[in-house]
């Protein structure tokens, strides 16, 4: 009986233990179910998250592709920009070199312009001086031409007077010869024609007076002839001097005209240089 009781107690204890274990198992099963449900929820959540991540990954990959494409475009743009920057740097360097050369050319052109301006001023002053000298030379040439005309006129007048004096002298000489012939004829007839002595004497005296007058006239004519000859020589000398002066002045005028042509050529060359310098500055 005791054994049965013990066995009953043992069985009861086992039942209690089994019940406890059953309860524990149930609890564990509920806990396991809860954990399973939670795990399923977490799995579903993870699946959703994975799906979301996959979607995000797809979007990210798509975005990455777009970004990579944009990056490639930007890299190409960067390379192009770098090439453009390099080209711009080269162009800037070339422009700086051109600027330096332009500044040098500008300085040279400025110096040439200053020299040309100075040369133009000097040429203008020289031109005015040459014009004044030309005017003065023209006035001197006019005066010398007038003197030459006057000298030629005096020479012509002297020639005319010389011809007239020579003609008159020839007439006087002819009269003297005739008077001498008459005197000789009178003297030869004195012996034969004593009755005509008085008449012949009077004629002789008249002839002597005429001869004396003729001699005086001849002396006067000779003096005048010498004076005219002297004046003629002086006129010829003045004419020769005037001609030499005219030739000298003509040479001086030719030289001045040559200098004026040279100055005009220089002025033209300076003007061409200035035009070229302005064109270079504009370019």
UniProtKB/Swiss-Prot annotation:
In terms of Pfam families, this protein maps to: Tropomyosin
Q: Which residues form a coiled coil?
A: 1-283
Q: Which UniProt keywords apply?
A: Coiled coil, Repeat
What does UniProt say about this protein's domains?
The molecule is in a coiled coil structure that is formed by 2 polypeptide chains. The sequence exhibits a prominent seven-residues periodicity.
Provide the assembly information. Homodimer.
The similarity annotation says: Belongs to the tropomyosin family.
Main role?
Tropomyosin, in association with the troponin complex, plays a central role in the calcium dependent regulation of muscle contraction.
Q: What is this protein called?
A: Tropomyosin
Q: Which organism is it from?
A: Locusta migratoria (Migratory locust)
């Amino acid at each position: 009986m005791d054994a049965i009781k013990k066995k009953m107690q043992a069985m009861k204890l086992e039942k209690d233990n089994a019940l406890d274990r059953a309860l524990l198992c149930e609890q564990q099963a509920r806990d396991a179910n809860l954990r399973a449900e939670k795990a399923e929820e977490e799995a579903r959540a993870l699946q959703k998250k994975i799906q979301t991540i996959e979607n995000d990954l797809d979007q990210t990959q798509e975005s990455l592709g777009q970004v990579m494409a944009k990056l490639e475009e930007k890299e190409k743009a960067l390379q192009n920009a770098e090439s453009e920057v390099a080209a711009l740097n080269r162009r800037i360097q070339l422009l700086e070199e051109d600027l330096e050369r332009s500044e040098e050319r500008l300085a040279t052109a400025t110096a040439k312009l200053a020299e040309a301006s100075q040369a133009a001023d000097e040429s203008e002053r020289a031109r005015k001086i040459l014009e004044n000298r030309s005017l003065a030379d023209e006035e001197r040439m006019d005066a010398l031409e007038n003197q030459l005309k006057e000298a030629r006129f005096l020479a012509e007048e002297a020639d005319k007077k010389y011809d007239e004096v020579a003609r008159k002298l020839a007439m006087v000489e002819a009269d003297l010869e005739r008077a001498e012939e008459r005197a000789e004829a009178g003297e030869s007839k004195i012996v034969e024609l004593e009755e005509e002595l008085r008449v012949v004497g009077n004629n002789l005296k008249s002839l002597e007076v005429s001869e004396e007058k003729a001699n005086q006239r001849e002396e006067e004519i000779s003096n005048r002839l010498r004076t005219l000859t002297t004046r003629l020589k002086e006129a010829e000398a003045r004419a020769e001097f005037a001609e030499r002066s005219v030739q000298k002045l003509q040479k001086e005028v030719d030289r001045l005209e040559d200098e004026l042509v040279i100055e005009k050529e220089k002025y033209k060359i300076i003007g061409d240089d200035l035009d070229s310098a302005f064109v270079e500055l504009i370019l």
